[in-house]
A protein has these predicted regions:
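Phosphate/pyrophosphate-binding betaalpha-module
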Residues: 16, 163-204, 208
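Glycine-rich oxoanion-binding loops at beta->alpha junctions
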Residues: 52-141, 181-192
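Accessory alpha-helical/coil subdomains and C-terminal extensions
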Residues: 35, 132, 140-145, 153-155, ...
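C-terminal non-catalytic interaction/assembly regions of soluble proteins
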Residues: 285, 289-367
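N-terminal phosphate-binding or glycine-rich loops at protein starts, especially the Walker A/P-loop
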Residues: 1-81
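Short glycine/serine/threonine-rich phosphate/pyrophosphate-binding segments
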Residues: 14-24, 45-46, 119-127, 138, ...
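Short, ordered loop/turn segments at secondary-structure junctions
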Residues: 10-13, 38-44, 115-116, 146-149, ...
């Protein structure tokens, strides 16, 4: 019996998403399932235009053909699947093997993403979400994302809808799995950029503070530090004082270290700093934008030590890199495993990598 699968990506992009989508579609095609791409995460299932879609088959195909002709007429000869879909004023469309054939090594997510929370306090749109899933006749949703995306998946599953999760976050800190898509590639980006910063720091006998992502976990910065030459790593799990950091820095100078690299996670809380992020307005999941801790730290240390100290924020560079071989392989395993669960009629699970094996855990474990 054929099944209709909707695929979406939520939250921040990460290396490995496009390959995972490709392998979901490829495996689903092999077993005779229909696959549909949902644009911009959960937002794509809340779009008002969905109610105008009467047929996910021939009706949609006609609209996409017209959209392609319009783009070509406007001399836009190179366009992605999402461009085609958006131009047709759609938020969901068929996703075939040919559509995703070149997605295997591409960075980001060609489906688009957002931080939309259908269950947001004060703006609960879960009823619309469920109605649209039913209108579209989607038997399963495969949601690729981190804690927020999996939380929505869990709540949707709890309401009786079939959801399979695939873990993604470059922070590498999602519960229920030993690996999340994008982590290894992001560590490689840290290594490459720290090596570049190291050359300049050495040339000018200066200290450089390199800020990485890592809201609640320092795993990314920690692994990045182990892959390259840094003098100090600061992570959210420990809140140092400026005085402690200054003491270590000065001690290294006394030991003959002429320059230094300090790696700091964005979520690190320096005890001397007021938590300026707490009063800021957050996204639909309540996440606020952090102050630039690396920049603040560099400025304060320069005043305290009378040394030349610079700062670099790697920020979104960590998300946007081409996936490395490891992330492509894991994307393959995760994507195939998701469809295999669907074949067995299993739902409410997240694909997991644990003890060296691909397995799955309840979505409740990922939140």
């Amino acid at each position: 019996m054929t099944k209709r699968i909707g695929i979406l990506t939520g939250g921040g992009d990460a290396p490995g998403l496009n390959p995972a989508i490709k392998y979901i579609v490829k495996k689903a095609s092999q077993v005779g399932y229909e696959t549909f791409g949902i644009t911009d995460g959960w937002k794509g299932l809340l779009e008002p235009g969905i109610e105008k879609i009467t047929d996910l088959g021939s009706d949609l195909q006609k609209r996409l053909e017209v959209s392609a002709m319009e783009l070509i007429k406007n001399r836009i000869h190179e366009f992605e699947w999402k461009d085609l879909v958006k131009n047709a004023r759609l938020s969901i469309a068929p996703l075939s093997k040919s559509d995703v054939s070149k997605w295997g090594k591409k960075p980001g997510t060609n489906l688009g993403s957002s931080r939309t929370n259908p269950f947001a306090k004060g703006n609960d749109r879960s009823k619309i979400l469920i109605e649209n899933i039913e209108k579209l006749g989607l038997d399963y949703i495969v949601a690729l994302g981190g804690e927020d995306t999996q939380t929505v998946g869990y709540r949707l599953s709890d309401l009786g809808k079939n959801v399979i999760g695939i873990p993604k976050t470059i922070d590498g800190d999602l519960p229920g799995t030993d690996y999340t898509l994008g982590f290894r590639t992001a560590v490689g980006v840290i290594k490459k950029n720290v090596e570049i910063a190291d050359g300049t720091a050495r040339s000018h006998n200066q200290t450089t503070v390199v800020e990485t992502m890592g809201r609640h976990s320092g795993l990314l910065a920690y692994e990045g530090a182990h892959s390259t030459n840094v003098g100090m790593v600061l992570i959210p799990e420990y809140s140092p004082s400026l005085e402690e950091i200054k003491t270590i820095l000065m001690r290294r100078k006394e030991q003959g270290v002429s320059y230094d690299i300090i790696l700091v996670s964005e979520g690190t809380k320096i005890r001397d700093y007021e938590d300026r992020s707490s009063a800021a307005k957050g996204d639909e999941f309540g996440h606020v934008k952090f102050d630039h801790v690396g920049q603040l730290l560099a400025s304060d240390l320069e005043d305290l030590t009378d040394q030349k100290i610079r700062s670099i924020s790697l920020g979104h560079l960590l998300r946007g890199a081409d996936p490395n071989g490891y992330d492509i392989d894991m994307a393959n395993h995760f994507g195939v495993a998701a469809v295999e669960l669907i074949e067995k009629g299993i739902s409410g699970r997240m694909i997991s990598y644990s003890d060296g094996k691909i397995t799955h855990v309840p979505l409740s474990r990922a939140i």
